[in-house]
From Swiss-Prot:
Protein name per Swiss-Prot or TrEMBL: Sulfite reductase, dissimilatory-type subunit alpha
Classification of source organism: Archaea, Methanobacteriati, Methanobacteriota, Archaeoglobi, Archaeoglobales
Cofactor: [4Fe-4S] cluster; siroheme
Subcellular compartments: Membrane
Notes on temperature effects: Highly thermostable. Inactive towards methylviologen below 55 degrees Celsius.
GO biological process: sulfate assimilation
Length: 418
């Protein structure tokens, strides 16, 4: 009789099954051990299945609250997992997760992947997740005493890898494939992501802030890494000038596409006109939604004056609900050495570190303190593109240095009435 009858039910049906995959890994690890390979946790995946079966029966998790574990010199990158069934299932007494810093754009050679798998087969359960929600390679399940040798072996590979971020620190920056794959990329996402990762190693590996901080780089407004929904600091490619239009290519599309219904009427601001002969765009009304460019990529392309918009505050639910990032900087040049972006980042971190409450994300701090104070921190003027909705009250607040002297107020001061 099966040891895991409840989990076996999850193997049925035409859809992918995580149970099938864990069982495959369990068989491969046990086979490797039987062949005499140096495998430290041959029964790790099998033990995980046993614990999960018990959790389904008991209707509760059997993972303890966690614990602080890491490698020498690092404060993050490892998520502690301890089982309260350690005596019953010793294979999962320790089952820590390691986050491994992925390459920009998630480009791998098979050689790099084989190196990763060889290290993890030796020191861990063999279970991986490509990739976690932040973008890291996830190694699922190892013991405390195997963390350091696993980390050292990763660093000694011909194509070496480092640990990513976890805890209240800078999480591993991630980027779309950008100019390596996409014709719409408005800046080099791969280079910027790598540069930020290497510049902020201390912030990445040593938790020091109120809570996590995520950076994602999207090459164009299509935002294939969902940066506006999943990062505190989204760097989304955009352009300042007009969309480039090839009228001959537009006519080719018109021969088989209903431009009026598929493009013109779906423009969110009504910025496009098509008279059957010529396509015109009122670029002052364009909000860079990319719909027209996506529908007619041979005819329409982003403008030549390219850079990025910075959005702030995106996150999943925790203290407050899920939030989509909003505009903090409408346009920024994205050129090496990226000083403007780094100056904004460092100003934000200093302010957040000083003013933020425990487990308060940067967006929640801005909600609490106000966008006006945030703009002072980053040295920017208010812009209509930062406004989510029109104001709903008549009150306006000014700093003293913003007020201009007047004869009326001077007279009130003389009379002691000010």
């Amino acid at each position: 009789m099966s040891e895991t009858p409840l989990l076996d039910e999850l193997e049925k049906g035409p859809w992918p099954s995580f149970v099938k995959e864990i069982k495959k890994t369990a068989e491969l690890m046990e086979k490797a051990a039987a062949e005499g390979k140096d495998v430290k946790m041959p029964k790790g995946a099998r033990g995980l299945l046993k614990q999960l079966e018990i959790s389904y029966k008991d209707k509760k998790t059997h993972w303890k609250h966690g614990g602080i574990v890491s490698v020498v010199g690092y404060g993050g990158g490892v998520i502690g997992r301890y089982s309260d069934l350690g005596e019953q299932i010793p294979e999962v007494e320790h089952f820590h997760t390691m986050r491994i810093n992925q390459p920009s754009g998630w480009f791998y050679s098979t050689k790099a992947l084989r190196g990763l798998c060889d290290v993890w087969e030796k020191w861990g359960s063999g279970l991986t997740n490509f990739h976690g929600s932040t973008g890291d390679i996830i190694f699922l399940g190892t013991r405390s005493e195997y963390l350091q040798p696993c980390f050292e072996d990763l660093g000694n590979l011909e194509i070496p890898f480092d640990i990513g971020g976890s805890g209240s620190d800078l999480r591993t920056p991630s980027a779309c494939m950008g100019p390596a794959l996409c014709e719409f990329a408005c800046y080099d996402t791969l280079e910027l992501c790598y540069d930020l990762t290497m510049t902020y190693q201390d912030e990445l590996h040593r938790p020091m802030w109120p809570y996590k901080f995520k950076i994602k780089c999207a090459g164009c407004p299509n935002d294939c890494v969902a940066s506006k929904a999943r990062s505190d600091f989204a760097i989304i490619g955009t352009w300042k000038d007009d969309i480039k239009v090839d009228q001959e290519a537009v006519k080719e599309y018109a021969s088989w596409m209903d431009i009026e219904n598929e493009v013109v009427k779906l423009c969110p601001t009504g910025a496009i006109k098509w008279d059957g002969k010529e396509l015109t765009i009122d670029n002052r009304e364009c909000v860079r939604c990319m719909h027209c460019i996506n529908k007619m990529p041979k005819a329409l392309k982003p403008g030549d004056e390219r850079g990025a918009t910075i959005l702030i505050g995106g996150k999943a639910p925790f203290v407050e609900g899920a939030v989509i990032g909003w505009v903090a900087v409408p346009f920024v040049e994205v050129e090496k050495p990226y000083d403007e972006i780094k100056e904004i980042l460092e100003a934000i971190w200093d302010w957040w570190d000083e003013e933020g409450k425990f487990r308060e994300r940067i967006g929640e701090l801005i909600w609490r303190k106000g966008m006006r104070e945030f703009l002072k921190v980053i040295g920017r003027e208010a812009d209509v593109r930062m406004v989510k909705a029109p104001r709903n009250n008549p009150f306006m607040f000014f700093e003293k240095d913003e007020l201009k002297p007047s004869a009326y107020t001077e007279e009130l001061k003389k009379r002691g009435m000010w």
